[in-house]
Design a protein with these regions (language model features):
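A cross-family phosphate/adenosyl-ligand binding-site feature
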Residues: 1-127, 135-195
């Protein structure tokens, strides 16, 4: 399976890192593109340094992909993900900022993440948007509805608590397992009614 992962400036970097691990474990081919704000959030939430240089941040992030991922610059309009003729099975934006969601809902594009999501929608391919922000304004809700009606799946980065998590990593894994389910990828996470 070939998956595009866009990382934007919303909080939720641990979800992106764990998703990379899950995709790599499933032998997926992964293209990663992080926005400028996404790099800052990755640096802050994963590595404790919002000023970590872009290249170092991405190199450290890719350690989670175990060699299965390739990085693309947000300004790379010639990347395969910018074309509907490229064979890509699924597109995920995790985390997805409300600014990115609004851009997608309007059909505008200013970087590779926006373009890749637009390609997914126009080609009828799987697109999963993972917002985290709360509370939500009426504009946020309308943008989510617009994106969903255009074909995107909205998967909020909100863990359940019924599985008895003992730590934050288990809460992250809960959400990532739901995300992998959306992509049709098998995982080891327990399901409802399992122990």
């Amino acid at each position: 399976m070939h998956v595009f992962l866009g990382i934007t400036g919303a909080s939720g970097a641990p979800y992106a890192a764990r998703l990379l691990e899950g995709l790599a474990a499933a032998d997926c081919e992964i293209g990663v593109c992080a926005s400028t704000a996404g790099i800052e959030v990755l640096g802050t939430e994963l590595f404790g340094d919002p000023n970590l240089p872009r290249d170092e941040t991405l190199a450290r992030l890719l350690e989670h992909a175990n060699g299965a991922a390739q990085v693309y610059d947000p300004s790379d309009w010639g990347a395969r993900y910018a074309s509907g003729s490229a064979k890509v099975d699924a597109y995920v934006i995790c985390p997805c900022s409300m600014g990115t969601l609004g851009t997608l809902a309007s059909g505008a594009m200013s970087n590779l993440i926006h373009r890749a999501a637009s390609v997914a929608l126009k080609e009828g391919r799987k697109l999963v948007l993972c917002p985290r922000e709360t509370p939500l304004s009426r504009i946020h809700l309308r943008n989510m509805l617009e994106a969903q009606e255009a074909g995107a799946t909205i998967l909020f980065l909100a863990p359940g608590f019924y599985h008895g998590a003992d730590n934050v990593d288990q809460l992250v894994d809960f959400v990532v397992s739901r995300l992998l389910d959306q992509l049709g990828i098998e995982h080891e996470a327990a399901r409802w009614g399992q122990t």
